[in-house]
């Protein structure tokens, strides 16, 4: 914030710190300025011997991949695509996940609670969260899933009613926190408090050592003016319990790599409306469609209206890719070690470009970068 810089005209001030190239007070722009620089270097070097080349430089990759979406079929003449947007030297990427957003909504008529009831707010915190693609396979807890389970059991054990439920705030992040307001008989107060305390210990035991420090607290709040009708309450908690969350399938041909997953990202219930948002991912487009259909059916059974949006294609890995074998051989000859072959469970432009230009043999690689999109960004020399 203390750096005055006009990115439309001011040059990036770079310097070398040990083995790293850094920028003074701004982002370095190596993601993906280094890729563009590499393309320009090849194009201007007349001493290099190679066949016909095309240079594809897209816009807005970080904010929505709009350039890749705008690529028309038939624009590219080449049959091989070298994507330069990966961030670890020595790694070759041969696949990525596509995604689709699911939003389920329901409007309902609120009811007034009996005046002699009391209310408590139950809050679940302390989860690690993380990226819903890259870290979905870590076994971390989802706050929306866990709190739905808690509320489900409380509704069975105690004569209680749901007033509101809220958790998560980003579709591509595993939710770390969630809270619910419950209404019940005053004589059950001590029993409910003890139950919540025991539940906290149970959840921590289940998720140790992946999660450490999950808290489940209960606090007194004013009696709300409205609660969720019993039938709607039961349907909503049931669908949150039943819907797919986490890893659904691994890639058969690439060990220890997620193919298909979903993230129960955002839940808001209250004030006469329920809304659930899920991000589904898969490197296999047909599996992504199957997951979206399965989730749609699940929420439809709860009486919710479902809308799918923001879909983009995945890049299904081909372990027999000719460019993969050529790149592996070239890397071994140059550096004496075999490169790592990976699939990323997140979006790359390759998925979109491959859908617009079928038949491309694609691979993604690049230099080692750290802390992109921040003033701490650096590129390894």
What are the roles of these predicted feature ranges?
Residues 1-52, 57, 61-63, 68-70, ...:
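Active-site metal-coordination/substrate-binding segment of hydrolases
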Residues 53-143, 151, 155:
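Fold-level recognition of mixed alpha/beta catalytic cores in primary-metabolism enzymes, strongest
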Residues 74, 139-157, 186-189, 232-241, ...:
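His/Asp/Glu-rich mid-to-C-terminal helical/loop segments that flank catalytic regions of hydrolases
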Residues 142-165, 317-360:
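Active-site-adjacent substrate-binding region
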Residues 170, 180-181, 215-227, 265-267, ...:
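A short beta-alpha structural unit
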Residues 190-204, 290-299:
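Short amphipathic alpha-helices in soluble, non-transmembrane regions
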Residues 195-259, 263-271:
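Hard-cation-handling environments
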Residues 252, 259-274, 335-381:
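Zn-dependent metallopeptidase/amidohydrolase metal-coordination segment
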């Amino acid at each position: 914030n203390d750096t005055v810089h006009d990115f439309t005209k001011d040059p990036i001030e770079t310097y070398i710190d040990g083995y790293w190239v850094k920028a003074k007070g701004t982002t370095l722009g190596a993601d993906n300025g280094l890729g563009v620089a590499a393309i320009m270097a090849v194009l201007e070097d007349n001493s290099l011997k190679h066949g016909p080349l095309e240079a594809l430089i897209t816009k807005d990759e970080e904010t929505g991949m709009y350039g890749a979406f705008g690529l028309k079929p038939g624009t590219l003449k080449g049959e091989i695509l070298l994507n330069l947007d990966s961030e670890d030297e020595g790694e070759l990427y041969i696949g990525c996940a596509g995604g689709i957003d699911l939003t389920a909504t329901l409007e309902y008529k609120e009811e007034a609670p009996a005046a002699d009831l009391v209310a408590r707010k139950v809050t679940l915190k302390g989860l690690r969260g993380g990226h819903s693609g890259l870290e979905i396979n870590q076994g971390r807890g989802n706050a929306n899933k866990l709190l739905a389970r808690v509320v489900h059991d409380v509704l069975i054990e105690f004569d209680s009613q749901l007033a509101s439920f809220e958790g998560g705030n980003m579709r591509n992040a595993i939710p770390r926190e969630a809270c619910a307001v419950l209404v019940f008989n005053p004589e059950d107060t001590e029993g409910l408090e003890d139950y919540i305390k025991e539940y906290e210990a149970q959840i921590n035991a289940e998720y140790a050592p992946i999660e450490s420090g999950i808290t489940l607290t209960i606090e007194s709040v004013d009696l709300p003016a409205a609660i969720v009708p019993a039938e709607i309450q039961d349907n909503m908690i049931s669908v949150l319990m039943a819907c797919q969350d986490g890893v659904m399938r691994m890639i058969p041909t690439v060990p220890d790599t997620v193919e298909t997953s979903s993230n129960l990202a955002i839940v808001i219930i209250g004030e006469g409306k329920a809304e659930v948002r899920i991000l589904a991912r898969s490197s296999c487009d047909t599996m992504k469609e199957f997951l979206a259909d399965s989730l749609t059916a699940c929420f439809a059974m709860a009486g919710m209206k479902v809308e799918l949006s923001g879909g983009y294609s995945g890049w299904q890995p081909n372990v027999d890719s000719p460019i993969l074998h050529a790149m592996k051989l070239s890397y071994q000859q140059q550096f004496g070690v075999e490169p790592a072959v990976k699939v990323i469970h997140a979006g790359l432009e390759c998925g979109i470009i491959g859908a617009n230009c079928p038949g491309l043999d694609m691979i993604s690689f690049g230099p080692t970068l750290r802390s992109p999109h921040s003033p701490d960004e650096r590129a390894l020399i």
